[in-house]
Regions:
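Short, conserved SAM-binding segment of the class I
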Residues: 80
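Nucleotide-sugar donor-binding catalytic core of glycosyltransferases
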Residues: 2-56, 63-77, 90, 95-101, ...
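Short beta-strand/loop segments at the ligand-binding rim of alpha/beta enzyme cores
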Residues: 84-89
Length: 203
C-alpha cells in the first residue's frame, strides 16, 4: 500500500448552519491533519460501488454514521462494508445505546478497529462480545476548535456570569444518568438561590 494510504471517510457532515461545529470540525480534521489522502464521503446510507471502494486502502466510519439504524446503514451498505478488503475503522459515540446490537453489527462487518469514548478498561467490558481480533482504542468526544484558541478571555473577576450550564431532556430509556444530567441545572438553582450568583442555566 505504500507509505501514503488512500482513505475514504464515510460520514454525515452537517451543513455549516446546523450548529454542529464539533461534528464538522472532527470530520474536517482528518483531511486537514492527515498525511494520507482523505476522501470525505458524506452520504447517509450510501457508499460507492464496490469497484470504486476497492481502490481505497482504508475505510473510516465516522460517528455521525450510526450502525444502529438503517437510515444510516442499510443492509446493502453493511454488506459493502463487510466485503471491503482494506482496513476498517469505526469511531463510535453515544455508547449507551443498544451496545449488544452494535457489537453484532461490528462483528458482522469485520471491523478491524473501534475508537470508543470510554476508558480502555471500561470499553473492554462494554464491548466484551466483540471478536477477539478487533482492536479497541480510546479517543475524545471532541477537541477545542482552533478558531477560539486566540480569543482573549476576561479574568474571572470581570465576568458577568458566575455559572453556566446546558443540558437537554433525554428520553426515559437512557435511564437515571440521563435524567440527572437534566435535573442538575434545576437543583443547582434551587440550592444556590440565596447565594447571589449570576447564573445562566438552561435545562
Amino acid at each position: 500500500m505504500g507509505s501514503k494510504f488512500k482513505i475514504i471517510l464515510f460520514c454525515d457532515r452537517p451543513s455549516e448552519n446546523q450548529s454542529a461545529s464539533t461534528i464538522i470540525d472532527h470530520i474536517d480534521s482528518f483531511k486537514k491533519y492527515s498525511k494520507h489522502e482523505i476522501v470525505v464521503w458524506s452520504k447517509r446510507n450510501a457508499l460507492p460501488d464496490n469497484d470504486v471502494l476497492a481502490s481505497f486502502d482504508c475505510l473510516i466510519i465516522h460517528y455521525s454514521i450510526s450502525l444502529l439504524y438503517e437510515r444510516y446503514v442499510s443492509r446493502e451498505t453493511l454488506e459493502k462494508i463487510k466485503s471491503f478488503e482494506g482496513l476498517k475503522v469505526l469511531f463510535i459515540q453515544d455508547e449507551y445505546r443498544r451496545v449488544d446490537f452494535a457489537c453484532g453489527q461490528i462483528n458482522y462487518a469485520n471491523i478491524d478497529m473501534v475508537y470508543s469514548c470510554a476508558p480502555i478498561e471500561v470499553a473492554r467490558k462494554m464491548y466484551a462480545s466483540l471478536n477477539e481480533n478487533i482492536i479497541l482504542k480510546t479517543t475524545l468526544t471532541g477537541y477545542v476548535p482552533e478558531g477560539i484558541c486566540d480569543i482573549l478571555l476576561n479574568p474571572t473577576s470581570q465576568r458577568t456570569i458566575d455559572v453556566g450550564y446546558r443540558a437537554r431532556k433525554c428520553p426515559f430509556f437512557l435511564g437515571k444518568k440521563g435524567i440527572e444530567k437534566y435535573l442538575i441545572g434545576k437543583y443547582f438553582l434551587d440550592y444556590t438561590n440565596d447565594l447571589n450568583l449570576s447564573s445562566n442555566i438552561s435545562s
